[in-house]
């Protein structure tokens, strides 16, 4: 018996698994299989990375993933109404139903060169870690369970989601819990990116496109007409002066601004896109309320400056990711910690915005784990992945899925 076989069995006992699971040599064989097939897992990671999956256009990569799930023998493999890919690995019982998931989309536009480069052990390419690593890990977990003949007491539902990034606003995972699998998920694990961290804090966000609109006019001839760009500037200045708590961490950002047609024309409109974040729902709500007061004040200031009205303020919500937190003492977090220890991964807990946000907000046991290895420059064209001992991330995901499905 190797050290990894012993670790798998010890983990099953420590995590509170049934005695039959703890004594099942197939679980240990599955961990060994993960290590043996890691080179193939990395090849799959590269293959998926070279299939573009820009925001709202994930279908080509999703089709490749659907085919992979069918080849692994999953049942009821399908697309749902929003484009998520779903397959079922039945257990001895329909419950507990554990979702093991990874997101399909990247932040990169359609024209991005997604060819992957290998330099020594390092692999680089846009999306190679976030989230082609997660997608490949989920497939490897299923493959290793199949090779070892593991039949979990509960069911594993495998999902590749759309819309995790940016203005996708978690549309895939929201549909999953609101429609496709509503009321039928007992635990949710998302695999996202490279590394070893366990994300148990859901950083919530509210995102807006704010537009000030007015009649416009010539910069000289119509001088004195309330100016949308000036109102926008007043709003940004007031917004930048807001005080937010350091704990719970709460942040804000003006990410994009625009408007106007010419240097010598009063704009018809000026706009900004804004991101508000906090891990605490109450802090996020307070920041949101303060932001809207800033907008009202900026509009009033611009009207008062010229002694007349004429501007309109359009507030469009373009993103709403709920905040929340799973306590470190929660069984699902404890199981993830023990799985990390069992395979020799460092234990680290953090907070982020991931697909797990939504089930956490619904009170469903959920978290996100990174997929092993090491990587940097996520969301950049020169993103890279170092596969040294990356199999440990897959092994952790496997152990966690098996124990949750007990």
Predicted regions and their residues:
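A non-catalytic alpha/beta surface segment that caps or lines the substrate-entry region
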Residues: 43-95
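Acidic-glycine-rich active-site phosphate/pyrophosphate-binding loop
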Residues: 104-118, 185, 200-211, 367
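Acidic/histidine-rich catalytic neighborhood of metal-dependent amide-processing enzymes
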Residues: 122, 127-205, 244-245, 264, ...
């Amino acid at each position: 018996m190797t050290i990894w076989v012993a670790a798998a069995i010890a983990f099953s006992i420590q995590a509170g698994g049934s005695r039959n699971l703890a004594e099942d040599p197939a679980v240990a064989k599955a961990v060994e299989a993960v290590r043996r097939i890691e080179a193939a897992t990395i090849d799959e990671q590269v293959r998926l990375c070279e299939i573009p999956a820009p925001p709202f256009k994930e279908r080509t990569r999703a089709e490749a993933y659907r085919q992979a799930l069918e080849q692994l023998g999953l049942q009821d493999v399908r697309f749902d109404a929003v484009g998520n890919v779903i397959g079922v690995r039945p257990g001895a019982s329909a419950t507990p139903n554990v979702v093991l998931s990874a997101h399909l989309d990247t932040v990169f536009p359609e024209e991005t060169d997604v060819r992957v480069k290998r330099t020594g052990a390092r692999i680089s390419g846009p999306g190679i870690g976030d989230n082609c690593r997660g997608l490949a890990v989920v497939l490897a977990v299923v493959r290793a369970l199949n090779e070892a003949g593991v039949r979990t007491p509960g069911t594993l539902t495998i999902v590749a989601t759309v819309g995790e990034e940016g203005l996708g606003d978690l549309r895939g995972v929201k549909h999953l819990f609101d429609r496709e699998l509503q009321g039928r998920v007992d635990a949710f694990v998302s695999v996202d990116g490279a590394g070893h961290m366990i994300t148990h804090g859901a950083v919530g966000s509210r995102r807006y496109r704010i537009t000030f609109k007015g009649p416009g006019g010539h910069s000289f001839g119509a001088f004195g007409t309330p100016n949308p760009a000036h109102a926008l500037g007043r709003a940004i200045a007031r917004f930048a002066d807001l005080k937010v708590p350091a704990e719970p961490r709460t942040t804000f950002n003006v990410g994009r601004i625009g408007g106007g047609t010419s240097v010598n024309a009063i704009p018809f409109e000026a706009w900004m896109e804004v991101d508000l974040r906090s891990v605490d729902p109450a802090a996020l709500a307070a920041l949101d309320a303060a932001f809207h007061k800033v907008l009202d004040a900026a509009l009033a200031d611009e009207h008062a400056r010229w002694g007349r009205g004429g501007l309109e303020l359009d507030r469009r919500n373009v993103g709403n990711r709920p905040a929340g937190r799973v306590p470190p003492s929660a069984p699902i977090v404890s199981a993830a910690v023990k799985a990390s220890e069992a395979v020799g991964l460092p234990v680290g807990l953090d907070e982020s915005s991931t697909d797990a946000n939504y089930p956490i907000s619904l009170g469903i046991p959920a978290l996100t784990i990174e997929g092993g290895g090491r990587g940097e420059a996520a969301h950049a064209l020169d993103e890279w992945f170092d596969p040294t001992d990356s199999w440990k991330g897959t092994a952790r995901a496997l152990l966690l899925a098996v124990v949750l499905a007990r």
